[in-house]
Amino acid sequence: MLSSLARVLQFGLLVFTSIFFLVDPLAAIPTFLVITAGADTGERRKTAKTAAFTCCVVLLGFAFAGTLIFRLFGITLVAFKIAGGVILMLIGLDMLRARRSPTKETLDETREGAEKENAGIIPLGIPMLAGPGSISTVMVLMGQSSEWWQTVCICIAVVITAVLSYWILAGADRVRRHLGDTGSRVLTRLMGLLLTAIAVQFILNGLADLGVVKSTK
């Protein structure tokens, strides 16, 4: 019983950290403040809620439609593991340098979003929160989940990440004030280090499935 609970907790923690670090709502704070400049508290909360809800729907949608997408385009899970790992590594390395990764969102997308009423959907919800890295991660995790509780863990992790993203964006002013620029950079680098390690593991798992390297599981 205890060993089973430990497995669930270990898997749940891995899934949550992978998804949360990729969604990275803390890194979205500067853009959120620019987009919502001049808005009152109610409007900011509404935008934050829209962004978080969009992120949740997109990630859950791709999580459950992943298998269908694989079949439709003839993509194997092994190929997606390796490709997803490469994307995660690029994002992680950019985070280690404490800079916004262009694989998540371009400057043009940020500028365009600032001029739109639905900025909570684009670019905040997509691609800032639900970007290529987080989408590919939930698809890979769901694709290699063989038991029902693993699927539940992934769904719960996505929902918790969306809720935390809302809280962080809704309180963007307070979060930025407490952390400061230096604190934000330090936290970003720590998250980047963990994300890079997860990316390496994704790639190793894919290579192990191909028989290129010995399994590390």
Predicted segments, located by residue:
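Transmembrane helix exit motif
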Residues: 87-109, 198-209
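Small-residue-enriched transmembrane helix starts and helix-helix packing motifs
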Residues: 1-22, 98, 105-125
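Generic transmembrane alpha-helix signature in multi-pass membrane proteins
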Residues: 17-20, 29-35, 122-127, 135-144
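Interfacial loop-to-helix junctions that mark the boundaries of transmembrane helices
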Residues: 1-16, 71-82, 145-157, 212-217
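Juxtamembrane transmembrane-helix termini in multi-pass membrane transport proteins
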Residues: 11-63
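Membrane-interface alpha-helices at helix entry/exit sites of multi-pass transporters
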Residues: 40-53, 148-159, 185-186
